[in-house]
Every structure is written in structure tokens, then in C-alpha cells.
A protein has these predicted regions:
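Residue-level preference for long, well-ordered alpha-helices that form the structural scaffold
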Residues: 58, 62, 143-147, 176, ...
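Active-site mouth loops of central-metabolism enzymes
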Residues: 2-12, 136-150, 248-256
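Active-site-proximal helices and loops of the catalytic beta/alpha 8
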Residues: 2, 16-22, 33-35, 40-49, ...
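A short alpha/beta connector and helix-capping loop motif
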Residues: 94-117, 181-202
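Aromatic-lined carbohydrate-binding surfaces of glycoside hydrolases
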Residues: 33-38, 84-104
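Aromatic- and acidic-residue-enriched carbohydrate-binding clefts of CAZyme catalytic domains
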Residues: 1, 35-71, 100-141
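Short glycine-centered, acidic/aromatic-flanked micro-motifs in structured strand/loop junctions
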Residues: 6, 56, 170
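An active-site-proximal structural segment forming one wall of the substrate-binding cleft
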Residues: 11-14, 20-24, 28, 69-78, ...
């Protein structure tokens, strides 16, 4: 599986480039979160990760646009994956607020059972903190059945549109069944058996043991893996976080397009599932011969896992 990550791309622009993506050897695309946002428009890179509810449609495209995209990718033998934000919702405009944004529905805002305690994680090595507290935004209480009902309703609508996979943002902050949180097992039971469908969650800077624990329920999107189950991971050389996030010192921002492409090619030589981040306003970052060669050469790796 060779996935192109298209954060910040309007759906109409993605449709226009599908043949080029296919020609580059990508068999799937991951698009920007489709939930309504607290500020609509081509703003900061992190805005798509501050949704206000669990509906479909924002500045990047409507529900009808999404259905059209899914049809167009299917025609080309490709798949569309949607980035899903369900660990938290948007905050008030002032920095550091853990209060829900005014646009969050009242039935969410005024239900105390919907939310995690209004405290941030201080120790990221403490699993209880990571899954129980907030990460700078109003955290949703995933253990609550009402919250899960809203999420599943949204995911079911995505499936009806023709979406063929979900990428769960901040999956590491949602606990495992072994930790008393019955979300990932329900996700797996509900969607894993759908034909040609992918479920994967973001677990970056996690131990091999933690990655393998999440791997029981889905594929794991991560930046490094040295375990025994490579078929359960999706590797990236660069992500939207490593390129844009000040908290990570934008550590890949200084890499040239060619450096990223060669790092990606190395991953394709070793792993069956990889993701390539399309740098903003830079078609050369994904549309270059090294990436095409990586995708085509990398298909041979499948033989090793069968």
C-alpha cells in the first residue's frame, strides 16, 4: 500500500491530479479531515485538526465532493482514506483553552460526560495521563457511549460515500481495551471486515510494544518500527507534523525534496505499507522520479510477507 498524504488539498484539486498520482505509483490517497472547522478557509496547517462536530463538509469539500472523489479513485483502482479527528474538538480562540469552541453543538458542550478533565498531559511517558487527559485541546471522553455513537454515525456516513479507510489522528491518546477503553475493538469489529478497507491510527514516538498493542486492532501509522509485525505498520519518512510543527522543531523542514524521496525509497524497500507527505505548494515533492521509482520498486516487498 503506497499512500499519498494530501493535507490542505481541496477535493476538486485532488480529482484534477488523480491520474498523476496513479502514474506515480500511489494506490491510495489520504485527504484532509472532512469535518466542519472552527475557521473555514485556507488557513494554518493545524486548523483541519480542530473540527467542531461529526458531520461531513468544510472548506475543502462538501459531502457530494467527497462522494465524487471516492468514485473517481475507485474508477482508477485507487482508494480514498479520510483523516478522522475524534480524540478532541476545537477550542476557544485564545491559546491554550480547553473550553469547546462556540460552534461546537450545545448537546456536546453542555454534557459534562462528553469531556475529559480539563487538564493537560504533563508526562507523555505516563499512559494513564496520555489516555485520560487533554493534549492542548478539549478532549473527548471516548469511554462514553454517547460520544462513540456520534463518532460511529459519522464513520458510517463516510463509508456510504465510498471511503475505503480511516486514519485516526492522535490514536495514541485513545486507550486500548486492555486499559479499559473499548473503542478500538469496536472500531475493528465494525469496519475491519469491510471489503478492501483500511483502519490505521497515528502512534508516533511510541515503543515497539505499544505499537504492537495497537496493531492488534488496526494498522499503525508511525515513524519508526523494529518489531516482528511489519505487515501491521505504515511507515513515513516525513509527516505534516515533522514538516510544520514548532513543537517538533519542524525537524524535516530543512530536508530537500530529494532527501525526503530517498528516505521514502528506503522505507519502500523494507515495508509493504508506506505514506508520502505532499509538501504544501510544492508539486515536485511528490511528482519526481525518485518517488515513482520507490513506489514501483517497493511493490516487490509484498512477496516477503506472503
Amino acid at each position: 500500500m503506497r499512500t499519498l498524504h494530501l493535507l490542505g488539498w481541496p477535493i476538486w484539486a485532488i480529482i484534477e491530479h488523480l491520474d498523476e498520482f496513479k502514474n506515480q505509483g500511489f494506490d491510495s490517497i489520504q485527504i484532509t479531515p472532512v469535518q466542519p472547522l472552527k475557521e473555514e478557509g485556507p488557513g494554518e496547517w493545524w486548523l483541519p485538526y480542530q473540527p467542531v462536530n461529526f458531520e461531513i463538509g468544510n472548506w475543502f469539500g462538501s459531502k457530494e465532493d467527497l462522494c465524487k472523489l471516492c468514485n473517481e479513485t475507485s474508477i482508477r483502482g485507487m482508494r480514498t482514506f479520510v483523516d478522522v479527528v475524534c480524540n478532541h474538538l476545537a477550542s476557544q480562540p485564545f491559546t491554550g483553552s480547553l473550553e469547546p469552541h462556540d460552534s461546537v453543538p450545545d448537546k456536546y458542550k453542555h454534557n459534562p460526560n462528553f469531556w475529559k478533565p480539563k487538564r493537560n498531559v504533563t508526562n507523555w511517558n505516563n499512559r494513564h495521563e496520555v489516555i485520560s487527559l487533554c493534549m492542548g485541546l478539549p478532549g473527548l471522553n471516548i469511554t462514553n457511549d454517547e460520544v462513540q455513537h456520534e463518532i460511529f454515525k459519522f464513520l458510517d456516513e463516510l463509508v456510504k460515500c465510498g471511503v475505503k479507510g480511516f486514519r485516526f489522528d492522535a490514536a495514541k491518546s485513545i486507550g486500548l481495551p486492555e486499559e479499559g477503553v473499548h473503542f478500538w475493538d469496536r472500531i475493528a469489529n465494525r469496519y475491519k471486515t469491510l471489503p478492501d478497507f483500511e483502519i490505521y491510527g497515528e502512534v508516533i514516538f511510541g515503543s515497539t510494544e505499544l505499537i504492537d498493542s495497537y496493531g492488534k486492532y488496526m494498522k499503525v501509522l508511525t515513524n519508526i518500527y523494529q518489531g516482528r509485525h511489519p505487515e501491521n505498520v505504515i511507515l513515513f519518512a516525513e509527516s505534516h507534523d515533522s514538516f510544520n510543527d514548532e513543537d517538533l522543531n519542524k525537524y524535516s523542514n530543512s530536508w530537500t525534496d530529494e532527501q525526503v524521496a530517498y528516505k521514502y525509497r528506503d522505507l519502500c524497500d523494507r515495508f509493504e505499507n508506506t505514506m508520502y507527505y505532499a509538501r504544501p505548494n510544492n508539486d515536485h515533492s511528490w511528482n519526481n522520479p525518485i518517488v515513482k521509482d520507490a513506489n514501483n520498486r517497493g511493490q516487490k516487498i509484498k512477496v516477503l510477507y506472503r
